[in-house]
């Protein structure tokens, strides 16, 4: 019974991996755009409008202004 369960889980994993790889080949532009958006993120400089501390280079957002 354990052997059957392991074989079943392995087969499910292989099927999921194959469908993910197929999806990436069909839509390479989506993969590139998500990769580019991660690379183009930057922090906000001093006196720029902010929403949270993590968006500021100084990690200090007070009254929606980076310090």
From Swiss-Prot:
Q: In which tissues is it expressed?
A: Expressed by the venom duct.
Maturation propeptide residues: 18-40
Please give the GO cellular component terms listed in this UniProt entry: extracellular region
> Which molecular function GO terms apply here?
ion channel inhibitor activity; toxin activity
Record's subcellular location: Secreted
Q: Does the keyword Secreted apply?
A: yes
- Protein keywords: Cleavage on pair of basic residues, Disulfide bond, Knottin, Secreted, Signal, Toxin
Signal sequence segment = 1-17
Q: Which family does it belong to?
A: Belongs to the conotoxin O1 superfamily.
Protein's name in the database: Conotoxin AbVIO
Q: Which organism is it from?
A: Conus abbreviatus
Q: What is the lineage of its organism?
A: Eukaryota, Metazoa, Spiralia, Lophotrochozoa, Mollusca
């Amino acid at each position: 019974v354990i052997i059957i369960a392991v074989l079943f889980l392995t087969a499910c994993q292989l099927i999921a991996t194959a469908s993910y790889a197929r999806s990436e080949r069909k839509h390479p532009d989506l993969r590139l755009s998500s990769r580019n958006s991660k690379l183009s993120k930057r922090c906000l400089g001093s006196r720029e409008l902010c929403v949270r501390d993590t968006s500021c280079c100084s990690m200090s957002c007070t009254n929606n202004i980076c310090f």
